[in-house]
Amino acid sequence: MDMEEKPKYGEPRKFDPSFKGPIQNRGCTDIVCCIIFIIAILGYLAVGILAWTHGDPRKVIYPTDSMGQFCGQGKLEKQPFLFYFNMMKCASPMVLLEFQCPTPQVCVQTCPNRTMTLITAISKPQDWEYYKSYCKEDPGHKAAAQILKEKLCPAYLVSSNPFLQRCFPSMGKKGEVITVGDQEKFSDGVNVLDAKDLMAGMKNASIVMEGRQVAMKIFEDYTKSWYWILICLLIAVVLSLIFIVLLRFLAGVMVWVMILMVVAVIAYGIAHCSIKYVSLKDTPGSNITLQQLGFQPDFAVYLHIRQTWLAFIIILAILELIIILLLIFLRNRIRVAVELMKEASRAIGYVMSSLVFPIFTFFLLAIVIAFWGVNAVFLSTSSEPVYKVFNETECVHSRETCNPENFTSSSMKSDCPHSQCLFAFYGGETPYHKYLILLQFYNVFLFFWCANFVTALGQMTLAGAFASYYWAFDKSKDMPAFPLCASLGRSLRYHTGSLAFGSLLLAIVQVIRVLLEYIDHKLKGAENKFAKFLLCCLKCCFWCLEKFIKFINRNAYIMVAIYGKNFCRSARDAFFLLMRNVVRVVVLDKVTDFILFLGKLLIVGLVGIFAFFFFSGQTDAFKGTAPSLHYYWVPILTVLVCSYLIAHGFFSVYAMCVDTLFLCFLEDLERNDGSAERPYLMSENLLNVLKKKNQAN
């Protein structure tokens, strides 16, 4: 007799009269992974202590002179500005590679406001006293030739202005002629130079600082607009709460209202962009392409180009078309999903504390992000000053490491008489500095692991609470008094290892994706098409793998919360259960996710429209109230991103509730048959949706 073939996706759940929801008598799961996670956390704290001991964030904030000292700090507190002896030396291409001009640099109290040479200043006592404040050290009574040979003082001073704590020549124009300090020409003590000779050096030095200038303007915009940003985010919170409450009582109506309002908001966006596109038709310069315009630090320039608004119209139109087509083809399934959301609304009504639980998760995530950020800053600034040989002409020792204290008597100086030993960058040769890159990698990896762990803890806690609701035959009597707290306690006490296991798998894939993005960035200029194709395939595969692991983890945590089994068994059971009901997974679960996404989109759209009209100053009602900003898109983008995160936090409760109830009623269908002995535990509405019914006793 042939042996009976086992089902491909396991046996359906059997009826168990003793099963009353999340099992109370359970043991610890995945203990080995729990121990590894605790050790990793202790190591993470050790890395933090090590970084805080060696790091110095001032290295990325303050300019550094040729000796590696911070301008405006310590004994140089009254000398906040960095002065370059010869700005024209900054025209070297090495400036863009090493971020260091091959000329002496000193910290000064103020930037020079006069133009003079060493030769003329040394003969006038009053001018000489002023001139010496821009020397590396007091030259005493040395002759001008000796001072220049030892590079104690600059050959000339040029009237300058401070920019990002650095002194740059005050460039101007008289007609078409470039001037410096209102002069077309100046002397360096030997030759008469044109003011334009300084431009190349200034250009390279300013390129290094241009990114910081944009960052400083953005920071300044935040200081002016943070109060209004918080108000916009408060509006997002209020809107999210209103939608959650309305979903509690008017789930069916609210779902269709959300859908129609999202369509309306996108339609308004298309109309607004079209009006802008047409209004710029006769504006001079508006017809140039984005490619011709190139990158501009002032992003408001792009809003005066017709092609920008055309791109917005196309993107919004495609999004609108996709949503409308999905609504047409999924209209029947949306009705089913509405009933599932109504059941989720009732579950949340019994576990009202779940609505504020995202705040707890957000708080833990904020701690993880802050710890990672502080560690990253301190690790990146824990190097020691490294000095290199700089020379204007070819030198055998060029870019070699040197010691400024004995450089003048070293063989390097004798081989290259015109060379200088200048501060180049921060590095180090100690064991700590040699393994610094590994510590930075560990910091990134633990960040992903801990962030995923916090997210997993939130998911398992909510799953346990909502499972308690579903499997309670009498909701008012059989549910625990504090289902959320009870579920959180079970998750931490018994399943820290399972949470760590699932989040570890996800962290590994995410770190690999980060490395692939880094490699892709490095190979952007490469011509090897096969390497690019292979890298693109790897990125696509790992993106899909990350999505799959997130899906499996989410359902595995639900099964762990209910049955208390280890991660692997729970993941297998959840996967098999879903595969045995694969059609229902698509019909109910994913359509519900789409509806919740539309809710997030609606909240972001409403808050984003308000933020746009407020910060752009295009509405008369806000002109006297809105702050004056360099880039008004900075607070708008911030509001959009944070509004989405806020909406996601509140709607994630609904999403987790739906996923949990979905798995529970799939098991309910397998365990029970609607008879008096084995009645379904789902609500009457769900029974009607699934065309099932309980028999009367």
UniProtKB/Swiss-Prot annotation:
Glycan-linked positions: N113, N204, N287, N391, N406
TM region(s), chain numbering: 31-51, 227-247, 250-270, 310-330, 354-374, 436-456, 499-519, 594-614, 633-653
Pfam families associated with the record: Choline_transpo
Keywords, comma-separated and alphabetical: Antiport, Cell membrane, Glycoprotein, Membrane, Mitochondrion, Mitochondrion outer membrane, Phosphoprotein, Transmembrane, Transmembrane helix, Transport
Membrane topology category: Multi-pass membrane protein
InterPro entries: Choline_transptr-like
Listed GO biological process terms: choline transport; ethanolamine transport; transmembrane transport
Cytoplasmic side: 1-30, 248-249, 331-353, 457-498, 615-632
Record carries keyword Nucleotide-binding: no
Parts of the chain on the Extracellular side: 52-226, 271-309, 375-435, 520-593, 654-697
GO cellular component: membrane; mitochondrial outer membrane; plasma membrane
Heme found in the keyword field: no
GO molecular function (one): choline transmembrane transporter activity
Reaction(s) this enzyme catalyzes, per UniProt: choline(out) + n H(+)(in) = choline(in) + n H(+)(out); ethanolamine(out) + n H(+)(in) = ethanolamine(in) + n H(+)(out)
Function: Choline/H+ antiporter, mainly in mitochodria. Also acts as a low-affinity ethanolamine/H+ antiporter, regulating the supply of extracellular ethanolamine (Etn) for the CDP-Etn pathway, redistribute intracellular Etn and balance the CDP-Cho and CDP-Etn arms of the Kennedy pathway.
Assigned protein family: Belongs to the CTL (choline transporter-like) family.
Protein name per its UniProtKB record: Choline transporter-like protein 2
Lineage of origin: Eukaryota, Metazoa, Chordata, Craniata, Vertebrata
